[in-house]
């Protein structure tokens, strides 16, 4: 019964690797890049953590616990990120490197304009469901519904047009969305929802035993690091470095470091503090193979 789920997890990982490899290949084809495109080009590298490491850790969880939702969340985050990175590089290729007459570059640009939204939603859901794969209690359903509604609304707004793409990414005039006026409040609500999801970990920590507290504390630390790099990284970098290129590289590097700390925290919880008992399963498997 669980074998198809394990197979699907492997397929997802290889799909992520293939899409990301194609994006990297297009990245080198698209070089050299003008100054305005440096931030976009660096997405290939700073999003590699999401596109490769997240589905890898997700596979580790799903192979041993096929019905554990947290593993699938990591795998889906990786897949959406890989699609986003590839779409970005293909759009650059189709608009600038080798201008194409058909609509595929525009479709790729359109995908880039809204795929980031479900990524943030899934990261928030991961924090909300960690470490059991379920809500802390039924009282937290309102937060899950809020995440779904906010994600759905922002996705619909961005699906309706390309109003929020960088103006220097394409020479074509951006389409405007009829619901653009409500985008601001929705974007402000996203960080608030993320903080509320993080607060659920603190609630779990207070109620948990010693072992579960160890599992949670690493993910809380990593989540705080990620939030700091996402929302404060650019501000700090601007105060230290004057060179725009250095700012971009260091700022995006900090974001990649933030995502990497999340992966490391999950691995510590899984392997060091027996989350899902995966360490025991791996140890027994190795002992069986040695015998």
Annotate the PLM regions.
Residues 1-291:
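Alpha-helical transmembrane segments of multi-pass integral membrane proteins
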